[in-house]
Amino acid sequence: MKVTRHGNEMDTVGEAPKVGDIFPTVIAYDEDDQAVTLPKNTGKKLLLSVVPSINTRVCSIETKRFNMEADNFKEVEFITVSDDSKEDQKNWCAAEGVTNLQLLHADKGDFAEVTGLDVPEFGHMARMVFILDETGRVIYEELVTEISSEPDYAKLLNELKK
């Protein structure tokens, strides 16, 4: 897949899951470095936001926005995955007061490769948002082709309301 960062074109390795696909089983890690298998089988929809680094302006804005929106969608689980270390994520969450979503790190393992979001030239994952139904099927996906841009919140939040 093609993405850009400040206009410079780069390629991901592989293809991300598309609408209609069952999301692949992947592992990310929580603040205690415990493996979390995604998608979770909680019987809820899942909004999965993948961001390059939580310590950048756009990733921070996006994650805080989803943390705020989680209050309006109690029937939806919100998870953000980034390439950051657990220490960076803990520090960011403490500073920003983010408590309504789960922040997972994918700085080890094969999350980026399995999801098709690895951008080797960038050294991080591409920015993408997925909404999965209760069975783990992708019902919405948005690859943010300009990595330094935010996703289309109105469009994806409308999808959550369905």
Which residues does each predicted region cover?
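Chalcogenol-based redox active-site neighborhoods
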Residues: 1-162
